[in-house]
């Protein structure tokens, strides 16, 4: 539970397709007997704005129309996502955060938030992330969105629009997450095989697995937020912005 001086708050920020159930996907780090445990720490992980698991997203009701936003959902930035977490912190009356931790998109959001938290934050752990998204990553993200847009259901006003495209998008993403030598080793084939390769079935499995639990609208929104990530925008550049994070 939260101690009297709020010195035991651990705040995790989930990645692109993650959710607020941090102990489920980071069980080696968060849990009863983990480094960050519930007996010693007050652990928070909220679903990000735009996420398919909660908060407001493209399937939420647009108050102007009374119907879901779908393709009219506003473009988000990591700065917007960080501000939504800051609003939550203020609502919860959390005065300080001992450790803020996030990976990938979560790391980008954590960096943005660390900039604004100032002395309220003691430690930040940023994993597999960056202060500014590179053209290389933007290219991978665009290829994934092209896969979604190529699905003939994309453009239709229903929650499952773009599902098959999302499967292909996930396959593209998996190639960026894995090292070529790792795939060459783990998906190695016998010389006799002509079809049905392990690498192909692995990517199809990963695509199908994600599409069963996630929606293309959130994938689109959050990869767009990743594209525009730049902690130095309007702050004198990346180096100047990072210098303010103590």
Predicted regions and their residues:
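Structured loop/turn residues at beta-strand edges in well-structured enzyme cores
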Residues: 5, 92-95, 119, 243
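A short alpha->loop->secondary-structure connector
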Residues: 62-67, 121
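N-terminal cap/lid subdomain of alpha/beta-hydrolase-fold enzymes
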Residues: 2-63
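Alpha/beta-hydrolase-fold enzymes
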Residues: 120-121, 126-209
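Conserved hydrolase catalytic core segment
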Residues: 95-137
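Conserved acidic catalytic loop of the alpha/beta-hydrolase fold
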Residues: 66-75, 79-99, 108
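Alpha/beta-hydrolase fold catalytic core
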Residues: 192-246
